[in-house]
């Protein structure tokens, strides 16, 4: 590797033509370092390396010029850059830069005033401004940077250009062998290069590189790309991130800093950006007009304070209808099907007696051994039957007052027809305790001669303790329930009457009648439904 270091003086005039002396002095402030590496064979061209040194700001110390001639192995070659490429790199179209390569006479270099970048087969150019030494790299290409005090290294290489085994790898180092196919790596702290994989469309760009690489997120002036006026962009489409705002929100274009991001925003989409686009600050204003991704159609009443108020008003308007459907005082929405509620969690609807009969109290325990003997008399006397009674007791009193027992006699063992009885007559039910002693004998008189076929009804026989002398007009608050018998009747399609289902009884301990110590007597009351008295079978 041979190097030629030239230092043009600021006062010298530039010479025209590539066939002038090897070093061309012009408006460039700094020095040139040119190196030539002969090819390994006769078929592959040599490699030329040109380094441009720009002195730091405030430095005017002259440099010593060193000039070396290239070996007379290559013929004269010339490369001119067109106006289009020069305009992209900051050159006016009428002043294209020219790079001239001569043969035995030496190495000639012609540069324009604003030329900083070179691309030629077998030519490597490195620009250095604030640092004395730089590294060579292979297969990398950095984007052009605006003039600033920060260091900016730019180089163009070919991957297939093998370095000279005896050449120098960097400035200030002694010549040494370099591994084939690999050059020194550029400092990653200076540039973050975004390379696009694939073949390069231009022969002067290495494999894996791109003629127009993507710009780094931050520019040289320290501003974000959103607040920097757009410059000449790449010729092809490049995805650009935009901040999309909802259609109802208009951003402040005059503000330099963006406010907090809205709670609901659309996803950013990549759209191709033209080279001569509008100002980047105005982009958030019209970006919401761009076509966005398809989203599920939302009800206009679902978003915004006005929509929420309308929905609330609609709910208040529909609440009276729901209350009429479910009953007064209930605002719960109507359900398609009633939800079954466990018997133990039902509320106490009606009287204490009704709650006991329907099993709305949680039982405290069961007593086994009770039996019941059932008989009837009338136009005919059916046979008496004895069935077991399931007895349950409850603890529903905060004080130690006695609670009644509930007994249930299941009639299903008698068959589907139940216990047959005459339409007019008397039913006798005798309850026995586990000791086979009579607890209570119930006698109920009934008359269902007008009952149609395939209907049903019931009778409820009660026994109260009422004060003596108040049998006719006893106050209900003064009555004390002692016994209760609930019978259910059903007429078949042929008109026969029978007891069906079960028989429910409420009774108390015998001490209840003895421990009162009051002048009370028993009073029997038999009740039946009135309107309607009979109900058709389901």
UniProtKB/Swiss-Prot annotation:
Family listed: Belongs to the ATOS family.
Compositionally biased spans, kind Pro residues: 227-238
Pfam family, one: Chromosome_seg
Region (Required for macropage invasion): 348-430
Record region (Transactivation domain 1 (TAD1)): 436-444
Compartments (UniProt record): Nucleus
Domain notes: The protein contains a transactivation domain (TAD) which may be required for transcriptional activation of a subset of target genes.
One GO CC term on file: nucleus
Protein name: Atos homolog protein B
Positions of modified residues (Phosphoserine): 254-255
Chief site of localization: nucleus
Organism: Pongo abelii
This protein's UniProt keywords: Nucleus, Phosphoprotein
